[in-house]
UniProtKB/Swiss-Prot annotation:
Coiled coil: none annotated. Transmembrane segments: none annotated. Gene3D superfamilies: Nucleic acid-binding proteins. InterPro entries: NA-bd_OB-fold, Ribosomal_uS17, Ribosomal_uS17_bact/chlr, Ribosomal_uS17_CS. The gene is rpsQ. One of its GO terms (molecular function) is structural constituent of ribosome. Keywords: Ribonucleoprotein, Ribosomal protein, RNA-binding, rRNA-binding. Belongs to the universal ribosomal protein uS17 family. This is Small ribosomal subunit protein uS17. It holds the Pfam family Ribosomal_S17. One of its GO terms (biological process) is translation. GO terms for cellular component: cytosolic small ribosomal subunit.
Length: 89
């Protein structure tokens, strides 16, 4: 990594909505340890990400990275689609 490059946060998640134009909603899951009982619990966050060209479908597993604010709710952009969802007919 060069001096000029910044560390950029990137996350993996599942697309849960693609109804907006150039925007997808990605659910990112994380595991958190319960403070009292010590059991690991799944917690999720829904993030709005910029999808130039509307290439994602619901159920796709994608990688997103943080960027400058694009709109009021979008500060993440789509990097790549890791796995396509299977089409059920």
């Amino acid at each position: 990594m060069n001096k000029n490059e910044k560390m950029v946060r990137s996350l993996m998640g599942t697309v849960v909505s693609n109804k907006m134009n150039d925007t997808v909603v990605v659910r990112v899951e994380r595991r958190v340890k319960h403070p009292k009982y010590g059991k690991f619990i799944k917690r999720s966050t829904k993030i709005h990400a910029h999808d130039k060209g509307n290439g994602c479908q619901i159920g796709d597993i994608v990688t997103i990275r943080e960027c400058r604010p694009i709109s009021k709710t979008k500060s993440w952009t789509l990097v790549k689609i890791n796995e396509r969802a299977e089409k059920v007919e």
